[in-house]
C-alpha cells in the first residue's frame, strides 16, 4: 500500500516500520500547539471568572460551556474542561466543536479511543471541519495507523493551508517512516507559518541528522533554543549536533545547559562526559 505525496508528483511509498531511530536522538513526539479554535480565549483567571458568569447567567447555552471548557483545557484543568464539554453536547447533541474539543481533552489524557469517537462525531456533523480532521489524524498517528493519519492531515491542510500544526504532524508521520526529505519539507512549511515554537525546529533538525546534514541540524537547533531557552530536548539535541560536527565547546555548553534544566538527564550526562565536559567550567554556547 502506498501514500500519495501532498502535491502532484510521484507516489511516496511509506514503509511501515516501527520506531524509526534517528542517529542516537529520539523523534519528536509532541505537538507544538493544540488545534486551537478560532477566537480562542487566553486561559487567565479573569477570563475564567467572566465565562463562569456567562454560564451562570445562561445555564442552557451550550456555547457558554464550550467556551469555558476551552479555557479550562488551556489551563490544564482537564476534568473541569471535560465536564463543560459534556454539558455542551448534552444541551446540543449536534454541536460539532464541543465534540472536537472534548476529543482533544481525551487525547491529552491518553484516552485515544474516546478521542477518536468524538472526532468521528464532529466530522460526521461537519466533514470539512479542519480542526477535527487534524485532531483525528493525531490520534491515528499515536495509534500507529499512518495511512488513516496521512489522509486526515491532507484533508486538514486542504481545508486550512495555513494550519502549521497539520504540516508539523504530517512531518512527524513522514519522519517516523524515515521519509526525511518529505518530513523536512513539511517542517519547513510549519516553521514558515509559525516561527515562535521550538518543536518544528527540533523535528527538522532530527531529520537533517538522519540524512547526516549536521550543519543544517545545528542551525535549526540554534533557532530552537533561541525560541525556547528552557526546552530540554532542544539543548540536548543541539549538543549532539555540535558533537557530531566536532565542536566540543558548543557541545559541552549545550549539554551543560541541558543539565542545568535537569541534572539527572541521562543522555545529557553521557554526552557531557563524551565531549570532556567538566562541571563548574564555563563554555561558549553560541
What are the residue ranges of the model-derived segments?
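Helix-start (N-cap) detector for alpha-helical repeat units in TPR-like alpha-solenoids
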Residues: 62-63, 96-97, 130-131, 164-165, ...
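A generic tandem-repeat structural signature
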Residues: 93-176
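Terminal, low-structured helical/coil segments at or just beyond the last alpha-helical repeat
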Residues: 3, 26-36, 42, 236, ...
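N-terminal leader/linker segments that initiate helical-solenoid repeat arrays
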Residues: 2, 6-7, 19-83, 90, ...
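Structural signature of tandem alpha-helical TPR/SEL1-like repeats
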Residues: 41-50, 76-87, 109-121, 143-155, ...
Amino acid at each position: 500500500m502506498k501514500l500519495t505525496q501532498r502535491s502532484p508528483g510521484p507516489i511516496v511509498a511509506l514503509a511501515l516500520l516501527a520506531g524509526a531511530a534517528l542517529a542516537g536522538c529520539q523523534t519528536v513526539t509532541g505537538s507544538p500547539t493544540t488545534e486551537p479554535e478560532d477566537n480562542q480565549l487566553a486561559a487567565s483567571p479573569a477570563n475564567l471568572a467572566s465565562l463562569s458568569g456567562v454560564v451562570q447567567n445562561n445555564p442552557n447555552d451550550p456555547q457558554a460551556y464550550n467556551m469555558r471548557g476551552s479555557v479550562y483545557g488551556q489551563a490544564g484543568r482537564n476534568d473541569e474542561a471535560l465536564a463543560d464539554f459534556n454539558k455542551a453536547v448534552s444541551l446540543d447533541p449536534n454541536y460539532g466543536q464541543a465534540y472536537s474539543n472534548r476529543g482533544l481533552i481525551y487525547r491529552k489524557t491518553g484516552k485515544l479511543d474516546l478521542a477518536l469517537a468524538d472526532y468521528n462525531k464532529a466530522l460526521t456533523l461537519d466533514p470539512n471541519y479542519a480542526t477535527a480532521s487534524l485532531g483525528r489524524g493525531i490520534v491515528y498517528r499515536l495509534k500507529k495507523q499512518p495511512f488513516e493519519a496521512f489522509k486526515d492531515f491532507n484533508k486538514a491542510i486542504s481545508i486550512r493551508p495555513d494550519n502549521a500544526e497539520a504540516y508539523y504532524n504530517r512531518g512527524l508521520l513522514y519522519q517516523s517512516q524515515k521519509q526525511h526529505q518529505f518530513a523536512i519539507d513539511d517542517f519547513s512549511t510549519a516553521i514558515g507559518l509559525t516561527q515562535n515554537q521550538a518543536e518544528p525546529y527540533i523535528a527538522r533538525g532530527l531529520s537533517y541528522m538522519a540524512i547526516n546534514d549536521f550543519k543544517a541540524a545545528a542551525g535549526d537547533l540554534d533557532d530552537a533554543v533561541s525560541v525556547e531557552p528552557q526546552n530540554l530536548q532542544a539543548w540536548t539535541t543541539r549538543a549532539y549536533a555540535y558533537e557530531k560536527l566536532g565542536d566540543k565547546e558548543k557541545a559541552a555548553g549545550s549539554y551543560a545547559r541541558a543539565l542545568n534544566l535537569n541534572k539527572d538527564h541521562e543522555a545529557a550526562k553521557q554526552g557531557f562526559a563524551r565531549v570532556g565536559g567538566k562541571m563548574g567550567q564555563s563554555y561558549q554556547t553560541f
